[in-house]
């Protein structure tokens, strides 16, 4: 598995005016699997462009201002998922995370997009989110918290 490359991706730590972070529960996982918006970087796309596109695709709005960014952070998939996700081409993701200030209203958020990824969403304190995500991403989220606080 270690010979496989990382998929390049990006993610959004989207904070509202109360300092809470946007999180949503994945639609494709029967377990409570929450996460922040994230996704791949398309060829020729800058990470900052990708994160804005991902917001539109996943939560229906890009009303956000980038106010900070992380270093590149990696996570590995568990062995049993490597062959099931991304057609077995990647061992995990190398991501650039952006701290973003939400500039819209809650009514601007629409997770019922063309290709829905989430079943519900909430504004949460960042430390609570760590316990709600899939276990293999918890160290990544701790790193995000340390870098973007």
Q: Can you describe what each PLM-predicted range is?
A:
Residues 42-135:
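Unchanged
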Residues 1-21, 40-43:
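Conserved N-terminal beta-strand and adjoining loop/helix that marks the start
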Residues 35-36:
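A short gly/proline-enriched turn/hairpin at secondary-structure junctions
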Residues 29-32:
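A conserved beta-turn-beta hairpin within the catalytic core of GNAT-like acetyltransferases
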Residues 15, 27, 53-57:
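Short alpha-helical scaffold segments that flank and stabilize functional sites
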Residues 139, 143-148:
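C-terminal alpha-helix
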